[in-house]
Amino acid sequence: MKNKILVFDIGGSFIKFSLYFQDKFMTKGKVATPLDSLENLLIVLKQIHNQFIDECEGVAVSMPGIVDSVTGHMVHGGSLRYINDINMIEVFKKAFHLPVAIENDGKCAALGEVWRGSLQGIADGVVLVVGTGMGGGIIFQGKLLKGHHLSAGEFSFIRTNNEHADNVDYLLGMQGSSSVLAKTVAKAKGLPEDAITGERVFKLIEEGDHTVQKIFQEYCRNIATQIINLQTILDPQKFVIGGGISANPLLVATIKEELEKLYLHSILNFVRADIEQSKLGNEANLLGAIYNYMQSHHLEV
C-alpha cells in the first residue's frame, strides 16, 4: 500500500499506535487511554496525529464496542463508557481532516489473522482474544461475520452458568479474563488483588506451584468448554487464540490438554477443534484496522 496510514488500537488501558507504509510499521508507541471523557480521548489522539501530520494520509481505528463500520455509528464503546449512540467516523474526520475507517477491536483481530496471520486461506475460522474480557471475531465463508445487531463475536457475554443470572462473574468475559485469573491467583496466595501479573502467574506455574497450576487448569477448562460449544454452533476449520496472555505458549497448550480431557470423557463423538496460537500477537488489531481501512476505501490489498 502506497498510502501512509496512521493506525490506532484503542483499548481499555492503552492506545497503541503506528504509522503504516509499504507493508511496514514505520514507528510504534503506546499511551494510556483516557477513561473520563471523549474530549480527552480526542486530545490524546490529536497529539499523536500531530507527530505525523505532514505524512499521514488516512486514519485506521480499532476500538471496543458495537460499531457499524460502514456508517460509523457506535451503539456503545464497551470499556469506553463515554461513547454512546454517536457517529465516530464523523468525530474522527472532524478531528483529523482525513479519510477514516473504524472497526470493533475483536473483529480487527480476526481481519488481521485473515490478512497476515493464522487464518490466511481459511474460509471459516474463529479468533478468541483473551484479555480484560473475551473478545474476538468470526470469519464465515471468507468474510467477517458481523451479525444482524453487529454483535457477532462478542464472546464476553456468553453465560457459563445458568444460575445467578444477575451475577456477571459467570459471563465468559469474567471466566476467561486474564486479569480475573491474576486476581484469583493473588487471592489464593493471600496477596492484594493487584500483586500478581499474568507473567507472574506463568512463573509460579513453571516453579511448580500446585495451587496456581490447579487454578490455571480450571481457567483453561472453562475456555475449552466454550470452544467445544462454538465448534458445535459454528463448525469452523480453526480457532486462533490471541491477546496478551496468549504470547506464552502454555496457554494454548493447556487449553488443548483440557479439550482432550473433555473429549475423552464424553460419550459423544464431537468434531475436534483445531486450535492455534496467534502468529501476530499484539499486532493483530493494528493489522486488522489497516486491512479494514483498505477495504473501506477500496485500496489495493
Label the predicted regions:
Residues 21, 63, 70, 140-141:
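A cytosolic small-molecule/anion-sensing beta-strand core signal
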Residues 120-175:
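Glycine-rich phosphate-binding loop of actin/hexokinase-like ATP-binding domains
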Residues 9, 60-64, 127-133:
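Short beta-strand segments
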Residues 100-106:
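General beta-strand structural signal in soluble alpha/beta enzymes
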Residues 105, 131, 289:
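Active-site glycine-centered loops adjacent to acidic/histidine catalytic or metal-binding residues
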Residues 1-58, 69-71, 92-97, 115-117, ...:
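ATP-binding/phosphotransfer module of carbohydrate and carboxylate kinases, centering on a glycine-rich
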Residues 73-85:
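A charged helix-plus-loop insertion that forms the helical arch/lid used to bind
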Residues 33-35, 82-83, 151-154:
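A short acidic/small-residue loop/turn micro-motif
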